[in-house]
């Protein structure tokens, strides 16, 4: 299916007015983009506060219209719709809708983390290098949930779990994956020796993806998933939390409380520059063993004090 895409650049303060006009002319969807993307001025917007909408200083609005829309007629209408809005830089182009799931699966390839952990798309063969070794192979279809192994925060956690598995820390114990997404970390822990895993996420779609991936990996009877309010109150020898730094800070007492005395905790999803605040919040409970960084993202790991 094809669409007519209309793109216009504006200041953040006038974004809502442009969006309202585009929608009034029948826009099927409006996407907001950073006008400085892929430049040195690019600025990440990760997590707004409650009731807050955070945008870039200069925004590109990209609106989709039916492909048969008369572009010149639409432009004339936009220019006369509301005084003060500048449509001089508007751009039109025809875009073709793609099977994005197929495109993504074509790009998602098997990956290795650490010594023996492999994340393999569910529809691909296990890599040759995984044969002949005690590989921990996780078959994965993330669906709509976060966690395919391609993001640095996930990779940092997978390498940590791989190391724990190699050191025998996971053997015979339980693991909590807080912010489980697709279930990738919980499943990796099970494949690396954990007996049982619990996944917690505030997104019901993530819980569904975790269950489906557990079935795909034949460990469904060893994984339970919960919304945060329903998660059992207990302690675990190993806890991993791959969420945002602000959430790690807000939930510090709760997350530390999940870790058994002498247990291991990994905190990920931390941008460079945010680690000091996270370390400060966990200092009362955690003896830090180390930090690892990849592409500006940091993982902190430590041991819960007795």
Curated annotation (Swiss-Prot):
Pfam families documented for this protein: PrmA
Main location: cytoplasm
InterPro entries: Ribosomal_L11_MeTrfase_PrmA, Ribosomal_PrmA_MeTrfase, SAM-dependent_MTases_sf
Annotated GO CC locations: cytosol
Coiled coil: none
GO molecular function annotations of the record: protein-lysine N-methyltransferase activity
Keyword S-adenosyl-L-methionine: yes
Documented EC number(s): 2.1.1.-
Enzyme class, spelled out: transferase
Positions contributing to S-adenosyl-L-methionine binding: 154, 179, 201, 242
Compartments it resides in: Cytoplasm
GO biological process, one term: methylation
Keywords, alphabetical: Cytoplasm, Methyltransferase, S-adenosyl-L-methionine, Transferase
Enzymatic reactions: L-lysyl-[protein] + 3 S-adenosyl-L-methionine = N(6),N(6),N(6)-trimethyl-L-lysyl-[protein] + 3 S-adenosyl-L-homocysteine + 3 H(+)
Biological role stated in the UniProt entry: Methylates ribosomal protein L11.
Similarity comment text for this entry: Belongs to the methyltransferase superfamily. PrmA family.
The protein, known as: Ribosomal protein L11 methyltransferase
Protein species of origin: Xylella fastidiosa (strain Temecula1 / ATCC 700964)
């Amino acid at each position: 299916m094809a669409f007519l895409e209309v793109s216009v650049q504006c200041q953040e303060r006038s974004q809502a007015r442009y969006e309202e006009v585009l929608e009034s002319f029948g826009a099927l969807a409006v996407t907001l983009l950073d006008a400085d993307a892929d430049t040195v001025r690019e600025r990440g917007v990760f997590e707004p506060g409650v009731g807050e909408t955070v945008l870039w200083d200069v925004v590109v609005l990209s609106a989709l219209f039916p492909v048969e829309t008369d572009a010149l007629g639409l432009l004339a209408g936009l220019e006369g719709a509301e005084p003060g809005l500048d449509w001089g830089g508007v751009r039109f182009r025809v875009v073709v809708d793609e099977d994005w799931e197929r495109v993504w699966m074509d790009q998602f390839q098997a990956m290795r983390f650490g010594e023996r952990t492999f994340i393999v798309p569910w529809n691909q063969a296990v890599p040759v290098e995984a044969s002949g070794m005690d590989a921990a192979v996780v078959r994965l279809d993330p669906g709509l949930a976060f966690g395919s192994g391609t993001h640095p925060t996930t990779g940092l956690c997978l390498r940590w779990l791989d190391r724990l598995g190699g050191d025998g820390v996971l053997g015979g114990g339980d693991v909590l994956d807080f912010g489980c997404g697709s279930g990738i970390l919980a499943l990796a822990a099970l494949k690396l020796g954990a007996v049982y895993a619990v996944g917690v996420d505030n997104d019901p779609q993530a819980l569904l993806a975790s269950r489906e991936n557990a079935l795909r990996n034949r460990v469904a009877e060893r994984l339970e998933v919960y919304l945060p309010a329903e998660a059992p109150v207990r302690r675990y020898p190993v806890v991993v939390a791959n969420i945002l730094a602000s959430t790690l800070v807000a939930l510090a007492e709760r997350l530390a409380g999940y870790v058994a005395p002498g247990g291991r905790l990994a905190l990920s999803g931390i941008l460079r520059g945010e680690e000091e605040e996270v370390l400060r919040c966990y200092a009362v409970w955690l003896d830090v063993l180390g930090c690892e960084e990849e592409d500006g993202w940091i993982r902190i790991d430590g041991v819960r004090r007795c």
